[in-house]
Amino acid sequence: MTQPLVGKQILIVEDEQVFRSLLDSWFSSLGATTVLAADGVDALELLGGFTPDLMICDIAMPRMNGLKLLEHIRNRGDQTPVLVISATENMADIAKALRLGVEDVLLKPVKDLNRLREMVFACLYPSMFNSRVEEEERLFRDWDAMVDNPAAAAKLLQELQPPVQQVISHCRVNYRQLVAADKPGLVLDIAALSENDLAFYCLDVTRAGHNGVLAALLLRALFNGLLQEQLAHQNQRLPELGALLKQVNHLLRQANLPGQFPLLVGYYHRELKNLILVSAGLNATLNTGEHQVQISNGVPLGTLGNAYLNQLSQRCDAWQCQIWGTGGRLRLMLSAE
């Protein structure tokens, strides 16, 4: 019988020696050539000398974890397909891995090798094993499950909140939030676009009933892709966030989510020291040390068919932004390293 993975090179990045050996044996039995790494540091050294067809990667590892490894390779333009196999129970880690472009996430313990085989084949042969129709059907099922279970949707949203302090795109970011402990209020999301720039948004989910939570989950899933698309089509190096918010407003209507969705979106480029902010219905003040600016709050998304927005741009290497609305208050702080 022909071995299906003959000619394929698989990089296995796993700190547990027994599980690493099991994966090595399993892939070898399918004909693949395997290369082994105990953590992200070893993997980066190996990736300097070859490009695998697929990387299998754990999240929790010594010296350099899987998320840091993914950030390194994506920032240098490496789009090697990655399948994460991890024992993590942290939804934020899973969400970050998916945002960094992994093909899929499989949770340990791996009990179904047929499922692993299907996922590996889908990574290596996407045109044969990935169906757009099936992906859309899965998406609709997941969306319907969130609509039918508001408590689960709110719990998921809470688990996806970013850590209160982190270093991202070589910037130190932290925030403080004052909201009711028993319900969602202001939802913050922040993510690196490259090693030099990042984007964030703050959404007040309290003015649209359960649709506020659903809008937050939808926005989290789509935001990075929308902004990357904006940047790809811009001749200049900075995005037009007003156009982005108009696109979000349109998507909320397409998703049949009525209500008001106060939203503030920001973008920061570390090398250019340029901060861009635009608000649709949230109050905010910006302090750069030299200047304090009141941001025009505008009209919440969902109120009108079109969003009419003013974009604020400031040059600074450190700043604080106070944001407030019906859902509470939040202070976001950034300093470039």
UniProtKB/Swiss-Prot annotation:
PROSITE patterns: RESPONSE_REGULATORY (PS50110). Under certain stress conditions, activity is inhibited by the anti-adapter proteins IraP, IraD and IraM. IraP is involved in response to phosphate stavation, IraD in response to DNA damage and IraM in response to magnesium starvation. IraD and IraM interact with inactive RssB, blocking its ability to interact with RpoS. IraP may mimic RpoS in its interaction with RssB and directly competing with RpoS for binding to RssB. GO terms for cellular component: cytosol; protein-DNA complex; sigma factor antagonist complex. This is Regulator of RpoS. Induction: Expression is induced during stationary phase by RpoS. InterPro entries: Bact_response_regulator (IPR050595), CheY-like_superfamily (IPR011006), PPM-type-like_dom_sf (IPR036457), RssB (IPR028616), Sig_transdc_resp-reg_receiver (IPR001789). Changing residue 143 to R: Resistant to both IraP and IraD. Increases stabilization by IraM. Disruption phenotype: Mutants exhibit nearly constitutively high levels of RpoS and are impaired in the post-transcriptional growth phase-related and osmotic regulation of RpoS. In exponentially growing cells, mutants exhibit significantly reduced levels of polyadenylation and increased stability of specific mRNAs.
